[in-house]
Amino acid sequence: MDIDVIIPVYRPGEDLVALLNRLYAQTVEIHKIILVETLDEEEKTSMEEETSAENSLLLHLQKQYKKIELYSVKKEDFDHGMTRRMAVEKSDADIFVMMTQDALPADRKLIEKLTAPLMGDIAVSYARQLPRKNCRAIERFTRRFNYPE
């Protein structure tokens, strides 16, 4: 079964690089990673005007990781549900995993554990997001409140 990972991104940085590294190290192969970048109007204009788009982190990552597909939406068109739905429509996989750009897999078995229940009669599987080790107190509280053990 093919598995795609869908990640909306906004002003991506090193967190996204770390996430991609961990996704490519998973025990279950990922068919493709669909990134949907939200762009401010000025960012979209400057990217279109650049003669060398090589400076874009996402374009660099797409070259480094061959299974990445890039899409973009304008900031004013971004909607949590509709943006993800658009990405799902770009997927041809049997299973898709939705992630956020700041959620790092704690181990190499995240995709395996998330998708294993879907091989049977289960339609949805989910995981909790742990706080980062060096996070602020508010992030630690929010993660523990939203995703209790």
Predicted regions and their residues:
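Glycine-rich, basic loop-to-helix element that forms the pyrophosphate-binding segment
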Residues: 74-91
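Short aromatic/hydrophobic "clamp" motif used to bind/position activated sugar donors
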Residues: 96
